[in-house]
Amino acid sequence: MRSMDRFGIWVLAILLVIQSSFGFYLPGSYPHKYEVGDYLNVKVNSLTSIETEMPFSYYSLPFCKPSEGIKDSAENLGELLMGDRIENSPYRFRMFKNESEIFLCQTDKLSADSLKLLKKRIDEMYQVNPMLDNLPAIRYTKRDGYVLRWTGYPVGIKVQDVYYVFNHLKFKVLVHKYEEAANVARVMGTGDAAEVIPTIGKKDSDVPGYMVVGFEVVPCSFAHNGESTKKLKMYERYTTPIKCDSTRVSMSVKEGQSIVFSYEVSFEESDIKWPSRWDAYLKMEGSKVHWFSILNSLMVITFLAGIVLVIFLRTVRRDLTRYEELDKEAQAQMNEELSGWKLVVGDVFRAPSNASLLCVMVGDGVQILGMAVVTILFAALGFMSPASRGTLITGMLFFYMILGIAAGYVSVRLWRTIGCGEHRGWMSVAWKAACFFPGIAFLILTTLNFLLWGSHSTGAIPFSLFVILLLLWFCISVPLTLIGGYFGAKAPHIEFPVRTNQIPREIPAQKYPSWLLVLGAGTLPFGTLFIELFFIMSSIWMGRVYYVFGFLFVVLILLVVVCAEVSLVLTYMHLCVEDYKWWWKSFFASGSVAIYIFIYSINYLVFDLKSLSGPVSATLYLGYSLFMVLAIMLATGTVGFLSSFWFVHYLFSSVKLD
């Protein structure tokens, strides 16, 4: 009865986590009330493209600049690492004031270099990403009877070898009447940099106000009369009507020609409430396919893992039960006729080769796995919303640094266990644990950063941020890892249940290479996550929104279970054929899933990112994929090793073999 109650509790918990993946989030900022006539300032993020994966500053192209100068918005660590550069723009509106034919500016005449760069950005399908009140602009297009939803709009378009630029923007701002229950101060400005303005002489309830709940844009290419705009100043009305037709283009770009930019804006009252304003971004097309595919994958993998677990437990338990039922004389006689895993009793806990490296990798794997579990759990509960840009990356860095204490503890305690309680060398192991994975990651990211620096991309990590990351590494992560190592050195080591012989036992020749089975074992864990992996890759490289962290958390838990089971089965199989070198094999039995993920990444590059242009972009993609695969290998390998270590210790402590 108790087991049924526990099962029901676990099922309820899983269902609650899955339910949280239906776009639930904590908004990340307070609703901002704008009175009629208040100014709304549009901001712009970096130019992005799925063809190059290299973001560039909005003002790297000949666009209009604000009269007060270009100002960067305050950005967190995660935004900078993601390549976001949010800046002010000259586009401004007045709340609930529809305006049309607004002249923005006339650029200088295009030089040969400016024209070449503009054409290159159009060829590479770069998108402009305006933002209002922290909401990215959405663009709707119709194709084959379907309505497609995009964020941002293209810089321009190429038609029959002629380049056209989108120089007139038609904005629509959806607003919802301010609700008194929100009880927020009147603010003026955008969502991520709002200035609080006290309301003097009147209460909020006396002042009608609105909240921004939607932001749409329609880009148009309109050929302005350059001569008639020379005397116009910014925000003055254009002399003739402008018809914005997104199906036609007329503003071609040529050397020695200037570009005139203009815009119009309309406001529309909407039933969308402020907490639901991100639903349009979170509910992307293909969601039904996503849900059913994930559910089907979970059912199949759970069923298969259950069968493997049942067969495995029955086999081992039957072996142990038969031994325990014998009397002492029969046990002594049976000990003389040992077979299978019982023959390696004197070698099963023999120290593996490169023991310190194994300890370091297991410690780093615990740190990475802990970071992933905590971060995804917080995201599934809604604490890391898309409204708060960069919080996911910032949270990952924070949890990774804090969990350095776990890496040091596990590495050193495992080192002392393998060394039968030896204290010498624990400081070296702790240092290696603090520097192994971060050092490799730093090497990969530095190499990729040089490529981004050479391309003048905003995705390049600034030197000041490099210094901050180094300080976080050596001033927080390393000391915490050493502290964890100290506690690991003070903690009692795990006693082995059997003694190790002085002379190693010879391993019988195998019919097939044992490492071949180890590498093949990664297919089962890969089957648990390859569907989810597609959506994650699409989010990273195709600019799609990913916010089903509830399902991702369930998949992560399932992955941990399957990795443990696969490693247990392979360890038992190796022991049965008298192969006692299980340490590294148990690690790579589950860690080999990283190989299949890297192969999948290459497949995704070839078939899904066909438009990715240039060796620099491909190198960036493969470099980031290698970084991701290394982290996955350490995390999954750690799960397999720790489960196998527990199993072997339990197996040989359950029966006395001398």
From Swiss-Prot:
Its main location: membrane. Keywords: Endosome, Golgi apparatus, Membrane, Signal, Transmembrane, Transmembrane helix. InterPro entries: EMP70. A motif (Golgi retention signal) lies at residues 656-658. The C-terminal KXD/E motif functions as a Golgi retention signal, certainly through the binding to the COP1 coatomer. Belongs to the nonaspanin (TM9SF) (TC 9.A.2) family. This is Transmembrane 9 superfamily member 11. It comes from Arabidopsis thaliana (Mouse-ear cress).
